[in-house]
Amino acid sequence: MAKILIVDDSKTSRRFLKDMLASAGHEVVAEALNGQEGIDKYFEYMPDLVTMDITMPGKDGITALTEIIERDSKAKIIMVTAAGQKSNMIEALKRGASDFIQKPFEANIIIDVIKKVLEE
């Protein structure tokens, strides 16, 4: 299945996503705690897909998304965040996010979205 990078400052969220993705047959190749670390690990591991939080210390998810897309326009990045204001969703999609999921969510939702994004 897919090689995935998780970018989220919440240890609980990273663990939840990692367990859920593993149970669906995906491999989490790396985890990052903030946007800059996410950018660095993206270009180190070149994953098939990234799940990215928006609100993180240091470089936020929207900035990291923008920097990754500028360097790799084919990057598949799903924003997975509690910061679910419509303005965040619109901004992320305008800057190249593949999709947007608001926390909390059910496991089947993210698995279905990942499948859809990978097939695009």
Predicted feature residues:
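Receiver (REC) domain active-site loop signature in two-component systems and cognate sites
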Residues: M56
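Short, conserved "switch-loop" micro-motifs in signal-transduction and mechanochemical regulators
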Residues: A83-G84
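C-terminal output helix
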Residues: F105-I114
